[in-house]
Amino acid sequence: MAHILMKQLLEAGVHFGHQTKRWCPKMKEYIFSERNGIHIIDLQKTLVKLEEAYEFAKEQAKEGKTFLFVGTKKQAQQTIEEEAKRCGAFYVNQRWLGGMLTNFTTIKSRIDYMVKLEELKNNGYFEKLPKKQANRLNRELEKLVKVFDGLRGIEKLPDVLYIVDPKREEIAVKEANKLGIPIIAIVDTNCDPELITYPIPGNDDAIRSIKLITSKIADAILEGKDLREKEADLQLKDEDLQSEIS
């Protein structure tokens, strides 16, 4: 993993958990202490878990797997979009619709419909319609783009989910677990880490904390993709060499 220092975690406030009265007892092993009614997360354990999640994401990307980043809380929306785009992942950062995974066929048809409406609009079709009908289609398109913009081009269920605040995104967690899709997630002190395949103990409310951890997962995906490309290049060179020999 690209070197990350304890100092970076501290500066980003990754160690600040929730109020002690809001904790999940299953997070006990990741809690270092309590200060002024707030749980303090053990950053040594955060580093270990972040390393595990990084290696998993890297290996999955190396195998050509697809990722879906999920984070609809205000503090996460911008980071989720930026980091997903940077590493070529799909993303949901506005609203998780029930069935996005478990009813994927219907969701895919809505995404296709959004793309079709955009094509019609860009080709000037809306301008030929009565104003009332054109306005209705424009409003419908705006709603579709808001929800599905980060899922353009998705053809099948994602292979891995990365989630900011799995307690808030509990429907996404349930759907992924039902389908056996592995989850990487930032788990704050109020979350159940047993629902997550690769939990990363950390502050899921502070923008800097979300940005730091999310960027590391994106880095892992990019590193895995780079390794995949290099292996493909080596294979091509070997095939060329074999054909020359024969």
From Swiss-Prot:
Q: Which UniProt keywords apply?
A: Ribonucleoprotein, Ribosomal protein
As one GO molecular function, the record gives: structural constituent of ribosome
Task: Name a single GO cellular component.
Answer: cytosolic small ribosomal subunit
CDD domains tied to this protein: RPS2 (cd01425)
- Name assigned to this protein: Small ribosomal subunit protein uS2
Biological processes annotated in GO? translation
UniProt lists the family membership as follows: Belongs to the universal ribosomal protein uS2 family.
- Give the gene that encodes this protein: rpsB
Q: Which HAMAP family match?
A: Ribosomal_uS2_B
